[in-house]
C-alpha cells in the first residue's frame, strides 16, 4: 500500500473528514487532499502528526514496516 492509500484508509477508518485530517496535520484542506491524491509528499512533521493521531508508527504509515504498533 502506498502513502496516499494509507492516509485515505486510516482517515476513513477513524471516520475523519479531509478537513479534520488537514487540521490535525496543520495544513490547508486542499494540501491534505493533494497528499491523498498522491500529488504531494507530506513533510515529516505532517507525517508524524498523522501517525500520532492514527496511533501507528511512522514506518507503518509510510509502508516501511508491517508492524502497526509504536514502540514506547
Residue ranges and their predicted role:
Residues 1-13:
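A short, Lys/Arg-rich alpha-helix, primarily the initiator
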Residues 12, 23, 52:
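Alpha-helical residues within the helix-turn-helix
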Amino acid at each position: 500500500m502506498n502513502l496516499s492509500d494509507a492516509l485515505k484508509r486510516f482517515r476513513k477508518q477513524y471516520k475523519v473528514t479531509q478537513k479534520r485530517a488537514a487540521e490535525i496535520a496543520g495544513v490547508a484542506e486542499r494540501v491534505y487532499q493533494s497528499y491523498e491524491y498522491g500529488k504531494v509528499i507530506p513533510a515529516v512533521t505532517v507525517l508524524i502528526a498523522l501517525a500520532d493521531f492514527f496511533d501507528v508508527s511512522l514506518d507503518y504509515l509510510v509502508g516501511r514496516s508491517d508492524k502497526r504498533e509504536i514502540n514506547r
